[in-house]
Amino acid sequence: MPVKIPDDLPAAEILESENIFVMSETRAANQDIRPMKVLILNLMPNKIETETQLLRLLGNTPLQVDVDLLRIHDKASKHTSIDHMNNFYRDFEQIRQKNYDGLIITGAPLGKIEFDEVSYWDHIREIIDWSQQHVTSVLFLCWAAHAALYHLFGLNRSLLEIKRAGVFSHKRTSVHYPLLRGFDDEFFAPHSRFAEMDIEKLRAHPELEVLTESDEAGAYMVLSKNNRNLFVMGHPEYQKSTLKDEYNRDIAQGLTPELPKNYFKNDDPDQEPISRWHSHGSLLVSNWLNYYVYQLTPYNLDDMTGITPWESKD
């Protein structure tokens, strides 16, 4: 949250140069406060587990957040009861006319399936397009980040021979973005995917900014320059055992997955995983919610005219 200070206080310029969030008394006096309305499109198979992971991150901020859960309307969930889906999830038609402060679209376990071959690809495209007019800021995670970069910017991913799974070291490529406030010079994040975006193409795109990257795992956080879309190539929401559960699931299915890198103590799957990404995962979501949702969204959600308009690749 911002520190409120008197107008024209000399310290303001110094604090802002150090990336400390300050707000003048005048601005604070004119700022209305209400709950943030966040929509979650949950594409992961275990809906309840993913809900819990994301709500844990959203709840770790001083903001009140009202959450709606969204599902793909014509796709039944194999791992979550129909009662749960009907009781807690909405179809797109139920929210199409609404506006939201934030939207989170999760990853999806689609392996090496091409985007155009995904059975619900047209619906994903429809929701992404809708979000650019009805949502202040969108957070895309893992598969959703790749899908949105492809749909919005025409940037396709490259498939990997071996799944990139593990916990990798990352570094900031800039220190001047509010999203990175509080980030260490080196931090860790989990990845679990069969594809990768070309980091040089991301860097070269005039509408994108690569904020953090990994020598082993490539681009991690990419922001559209209108601040409306944040693409995160990994899984900051993952809990300590998630990569282990995925590894054991693949083995149970008769696959031969590689051991997740930098994850198990002594690279021994019988030992406890090492958790070292939760603080930065929490900080990422907190910074996004504060600086790119709360600080940018209109008080009256019925009027989105003040939000920077989206310009498509066409």
UniProtKB/Swiss-Prot annotation:
Per UniProt, substrate binds at 163, 192, 249
**Where's it mainly located?**
cytoplasm
Pfam families membership: HTS
List localization entries: Cytoplasm
Which keywords label this protein?
Answer: Acyltransferase, Amino-acid biosynthesis, Cytoplasm, Methionine biosynthesis, Transferase
Describe the reaction catalysed, as an equation.
L-homoserine + succinyl-CoA = O-succinyl-L-homoserine + CoA
Q: According to UniProt, where does the site described as Important for acyl-CoA specificity lie?
A: 111
> In its keyword annotation, does this UniProt entry include Transferase?
yes
- What protein family is recorded? Belongs to the MetA family.
Q: What is this protein called?
A: Homoserine O-succinyltransferase
